[in-house]
Amino acid sequence: MPEDGAGDGGEVPALIPDGEPLREEQRPLKQSLGSSLCRESHWKCLLLTLLIHACGAVVAWCRLATVPRLVLGPEAALARGAGGPPPTYPASPCSDGYLYIPLAFVSLLYLLYLAECWHCHVRSCQAPRTDAHTVLALIRRLQQAPPCVWWKATSYHYVRRTRQITRYRNGDAYTTTQVYHERADSRTARGEFDYSAHGVRDVSKELVGLAEHAATRLRFTKCFSFGSAEAEASYLTQRARFFSANEGLDDYLEAREGMHLKDVDFRESLMVFADPRSPPWYARAWVFWLVSAATLSWPLRVVAAYGTAHVHYQVEKLFGASSPPPGAVPSGPPLSRVATVDFTELEWHICSNRQLVPSYSEAVVMGAGSGAYLRGCQRCRRSVSSNSLPPARPSGPRLPFSRSRLSLGAGGRATPGVFRSLSGGPLGRRGEDTEPLESPPCYEDALYFPVLIVHGDSGCQGDGQGAL
């Protein structure tokens, strides 16, 4: 809540609890006339109003205007025989029943106009009306509410069913069998982001100046962000683990995710008045219907939109803003990267927690002895990027994981595989001293045996190396 300052007499936002820095202020903005027209044009009401007034102008023209009409009969024949002008008389241009056509259009358009006004009134009443103090208390509860980032996975399939329906053709009823497919949910799983090891903090803005406007339309949204790379990696890892664990359980998978605030009633739209018991004249119901009956609803809506201030308040939660508590325990094994789900071998190492995959910059500056801890292990020799080159070129530069791929061999053979360079150049060309590459396996072998590295339960204990 803002309070008066002692020196400059301005407003200073309140301090966030726990000694955090001051929040950034946010004020409602009053739009110009052109901006209010672009924001809420109410084109249906404007179009119906113009059509009603056009039909009314046609009716008035038919009743008030006169046109000369020729006189038929003996008098006209005598006038033509005498060589004078033909006799005429003034008459209405919409005689002979043509006046009822614009009247019918006016009646129909007026009914449509009243229906559109009723829909507009219902939409305006859907937003709850409250005062500024209640809104500030609600914002304080939103800022203090703990977030919950959730995931939902629904496994389902379609069941073929039949039903009997009756159809009519040429007055005869006949029964036919209709085949349709009905969705059947087989399993539903829910998960939440565990941020206890990273902490969370509210970084929403401080809303001030609500009492300065007679009417303010407030729109709420919520979002979250990350203050550290560790928190973002933990979120992506938990999310990928959740959806990968629920993938393939049925024919189809419906994935949903979102965020809600616990123990608080979140409303997306509010109408705030300085005094809800006496709102401005353009926001009263009897004024709206009185003006609408006179087909002046569109000008009233323009005045109301111009006199209403707007503010979009976003509740934002920041994960990873504080250091983890002393007793915090990670929710699972530390998976380094989730962008390697398409690489079978790297994903196997990550899920098994056997090795940490370096980033591209780390792999470029990796030294010659970075893979020495695995050279003694015959079963892990193929998982090190320093062994990705053919043995005939031991002193050549090394390829990072992101620039090489494994040439798949037979599933049960112990012959070390060879990495092929995708970057071209000397590393991608086969020299005379390069060993011949193994032929790739067939599609079925690669599909059923995607992982060529087999580790025992004891890791590398048998080869004299510790577990990674």
Curated annotation (Swiss-Prot):
Effect of C45G: In EKD3; uncertain significance
Outcome reported for the amino acid change (mutating F193S): In EKD3; uncertain significance
Effect of E257K: In EKD3; uncertain significance
Keyword terms: Cell projection, Disease variant, Dystonia, Endoplasmic reticulum, Membrane, Transmembrane, Transmembrane helix
Outcome (variant: T166K): In EKD3; uncertain significance
GO cellular component, one term: membrane
Known outcome of mutating S297T: In EKD3; uncertain significance
Family the UniProt entry places it in: Belongs to the TMEM151 family.
Coiled-coil intervals: none
Localization: Endoplasmic reticulum membrane; Cell projection, Axon; Cell projection, Dendrite
Chain segments annotated as transmembrane: 45-65, 98-118
Signal peptide: none
Pfam families referenced in this protein's UniProt entry, alphabetically: TMEM151 (PF14857)
Phenotype for L47P: In EKD3; uncertain significance
Principal localisation: endoplasmic reticulum
Renumbered residue ranges of the record's region Disordered: 1-21, 384-438
Organism: Homo sapiens
Associated disease: Episodic kinesigenic dyskinesia 3: A form of paroxysmal kinesigenic dyskinesia, a neurologic condition characterized by recurrent and brief attacks of abnormal involuntary movements. These attacks can involve dystonic postures, chorea, or athetosis. EKD3 is an autosomal dominant form with incomplete penetrance and onset in late childhood or early adolescence. Symptoms are usually triggered by sudden movement or stress, and resolve in most patients in their early twenties or later.
Membrane topology, record value: Multi-pass membrane protein
Outcome recorded upon mutating F319L: In EKD3; uncertain significance
Name of this protein: Transmembrane protein 151A
Superkingdom assignment: Eukaryota
Record keyword Transmembrane present: yes
